[in-house]
UniProtKB/Swiss-Prot annotation:
This is HSPA8-interacting micropeptide miPEP155. Detected in dendritic cells (at protein level). GO terms for biological process: immune system process; negative regulation of dendritic cell antigen processing and presentation. Its main location: cytoplasm. The keyword Nucleus applies. Interacts with molecular chaperone HSPA8/HSC70 (via N-terminal ATP-binding region); the interaction results in reduced ATPase activity of HSPA8, impaired interaction of HSPA8 with HSP90 and reduced lysosomal antigen trafficking. It comes from Homo sapiens (Human). The gene is MIR155HG. Induction: Up-regulated in antigen-presenting cells in inflamed dermis. The lineage of its organism: Eukaryota, Metazoa, Chordata, Craniata, Vertebrata. The keyword Secreted does not apply. GO terms for molecular function: Hsp70 protein binding.
C-alpha cells in the first residue's frame, strides 16, 4: 500500500486503500 498515495487520495476526499 502506498502511504503517500493513500494520504494524497484521502486529502482530496477519496478513501482509496
Amino acid at each position: 500500500m502506498e502511504m503517500a498515495l493513500m494520504v494524497a487520495q484521502t486529502r482530496k476526499g477519496k478513501s482509496v486503500v
